[in-house]
Amino acid sequence: MVEFYFDIETHSPSEKPNVAQDKIITIQYRELSPDGNPRGDLQILTEWDCGSEKALLETFAKVFLTENTWDFVPVGFNLYGFDLLSLLLRFNHHFGTSHGLSWFYDKPVLDIKPVLVIMGRCFKGCGDPFGKQSPNPIRGWYESGETGRQQNIDYIVRESNRFISILQSLKWDIPRLREGLQKVVVT
């Protein structure tokens, strides 16, 4: 099983994001060791470097859609609620596929959002540790063209580093939690 930090950024022309229509403008991923340490560099695929959203998706498909579902296990935050759903819908849009949510049933995924919700005992604010800004500045940077590209990249790198730090902490703490749960089950 090869875990990869995984995230996307999208451009929404309207005030609120629309996962069914918003264009994917970046896909970023980084291989992780079993304890969450980065292996290799953060890969940032951008719509502007690839030439189009469709070309971006074609490039990522070579890494993501292999014959072995364990070759790329996405690890991230809110993957089922946003990133993977957006990816699925944009693949359907560009390639005429009709994949439903069942497309991901056999795909191993580690989404840490439920863990952070349980830890904070609420949904509101569970993504705060990643430094998400509200309103999201990605839209403005993207719309400013070439001048905003480096700001997008810097934001992505910071968010990736924060996520990896949180993941490493969780991977350290969860075995201790498991020991505590085993004591509860035994008694």
Where do the language-model regions lie?
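Metal-dependent phosphoesterase core characteristic of DEDDh/y 3'-5' exonuclease domains
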Residues: K23-Q28, R39-G40, D71-T187
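Conserved RNase H-like, two-metal-ion catalytic cores of nucleic-acid enzymes
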Residues: M1-T66
